[in-house]
């Protein structure tokens, strides 16, 4: 199992190209099951979760080529199962459920695994598909779904759900009639998925708002080559790295219109930004200022940036308060940051961080994807060596993060 050895305390300077968004790539890859033919993508990141989705599609009969471009051939899809051994490693595997039921009238998908950061129930997906006419049962840990043809309906989410919105939007594209999804999630990744579905011939209005309207069509067809949006969480993570290290980093290929809340809070912490061609330049201060945040659905401050922001705040001037409102059990990185000298207390969904002048390197363990990124940030600003175990979590969501950091001047070694 790989580990990362980080020698902290070095200034980071240079240029980084932001990878394609994992959370856009995964649903768009799942959407290829809706349309027979060859789908061609630019900027799909080479990540553990992407390779899991690739294997899922291959086992169903798809052919996937992964070079500079990603090509997915769905002509010979003849199996409709997502097995436990793959789904347990990635919750986003549930995204094949809607497309399979919509196009083939059946699906067998294992209940999800993936991050250990909360229940993330799939009942919203199941309830929505049932409203569209699917017959669904749970058998031995699998969701078994059948439908002759899904029917358009009105669906209301009690709470906005990103994967639920994506799954039901995909399913609705081939349903008979009109589907309206109310209290839909608004994330940019949902808009990117909708844009790809529209290019395939889907009729979708309102993606990126709380009400999405989908008029079903009889058939979808693969469009020309499509480019995935840049990863806003990777962008935010590198902003946090620049801020924490007092760095000067240019981020190329990012979309600043996707990260308004992140940029506003980073500015409050003392980080400076300059727009450059096709990106932004991020300049960290001599010392960060403490800032409070509350995680919220998009366009609020993203829960996927909470751990990285906390790592910054461990060495900020003053006391900051972080409220986590999206997922329970998402402060698992706190114990590891404390091992490095951070002064953090947690009560319920609220963490209070009293900034210290220095962190000290220590052996620590990654518990989930974004927690692993927070430990990398802590390691970069700490004195002496930090050894991070279980970095397979990091590889699930960041494309060659260690190599990108080395380009900026970090001393990092991957240990097998």
From Swiss-Prot:
Keyword Transferase: yes
Record organism: Thermodesulfovibrio yellowstonii (strain ATCC 51303 / DSM 11347 / YP87)
Record function comment: Cell wall formation. Adds enolpyruvyl to UDP-N-acetylglucosamine.
GO biological process: cell division; cell wall organization; peptidoglycan biosynthetic process; regulation of cell shape; UDP-N-acetylgalactosamine biosynthetic process
Record NCBIfam families: murA, PRK09369.1
Protein name in the entry: UDP-N-acetylglucosamine 1-carboxyvinyltransferase
Known EC number: 2.5.1.7
MF term (GO), any: UDP-N-acetylglucosamine 1-carboxyvinyltransferase activity
Keyword line: Cell cycle, Cell division, Cell shape, Cell wall biogenesis/degradation, Cytoplasm, Peptidoglycan synthesis, Pyruvate, Transferase
């Amino acid at each position: 199992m790989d580990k990362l050895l980080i020698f902290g305390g070095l200034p980071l300077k240079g240029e980084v190209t932001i990878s394609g968004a994992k959370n856009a790539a995964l649903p768009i890859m799942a959407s290829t099951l809706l349309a027979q033919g060859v789908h061609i993508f630019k900027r799909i990141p080479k990540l553990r979760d992407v390779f899991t989705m690739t294997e899922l599609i291959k086992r169903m009969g798809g052919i996937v080529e992964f070079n500079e471009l990603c090509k997915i051939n769905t002509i010979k899809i003849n199996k409709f199962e997502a097995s436990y051994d793959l789904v347990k490693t990635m919750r986003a595997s549930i995204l094949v459920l809607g497309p399979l039921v919509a196009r083939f009238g059946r699906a067998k998908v294992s209940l999800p695994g993936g991050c250990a950061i909360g229940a993330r129930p799939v009942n919203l997906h199941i309830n929505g598909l049932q409203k569209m006419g699917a017959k669904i049962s749970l058998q031995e840990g699998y969701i078994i779904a059948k439908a002759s043809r899904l029917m358009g309906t009105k669906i209301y989410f009690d709470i906005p759900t990103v994967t639920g919105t994506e799954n039901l939007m995909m399913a609705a594209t081939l349903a008979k009639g009109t589907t309206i999804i109310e209290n839909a999630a608004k994330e940019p990744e949902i808009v990117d998925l909708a844009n790809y579905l529209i290019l395939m011939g889907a009729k979708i209005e309102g993606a990126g708002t709380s009400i999405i309207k989908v008029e079903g069509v009889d058939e979808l067809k693969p469009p020309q080559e499509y480019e995935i949006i840049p990863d806003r969480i990777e962008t935010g993570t590198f902003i946090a790295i620049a801020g924490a290290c007092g760095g000067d980093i240019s981020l190329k290929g990012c979309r600043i219109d996707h990260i308004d809340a992140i940029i506003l809070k980073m500015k409050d912490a003392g980080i400076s930004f300059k727009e450059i061609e096709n990106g932004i330049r991020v300049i960290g201060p001599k010392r960060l200022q403490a800032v409070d945040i509350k995680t919220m659905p998009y366009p609020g401050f993203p829960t996927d940036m909470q751990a990285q922001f906390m790592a910054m705040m461990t060495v900020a001037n003053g006391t900051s308060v972080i409220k986590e409102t999206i997922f329970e059990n998402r402060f698992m990185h706190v114990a590891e940051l404390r091992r490095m000298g951070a002064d953090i207390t947690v009560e319920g969904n609220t963490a209070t961080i009293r900034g210290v002048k220095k962190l000290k390197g220590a052996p620590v363990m990654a518990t989930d994807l974004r927690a692993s990124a927070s430990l990398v940030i802590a390691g970069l600003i700490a004195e002496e060596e930090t050894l991070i175990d279980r970095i397979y979590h990091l590889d699930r969501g960041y494309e060659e993060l260690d190599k990108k950091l080395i380009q900026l001047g970090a001393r990092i070694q991957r240990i097998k």
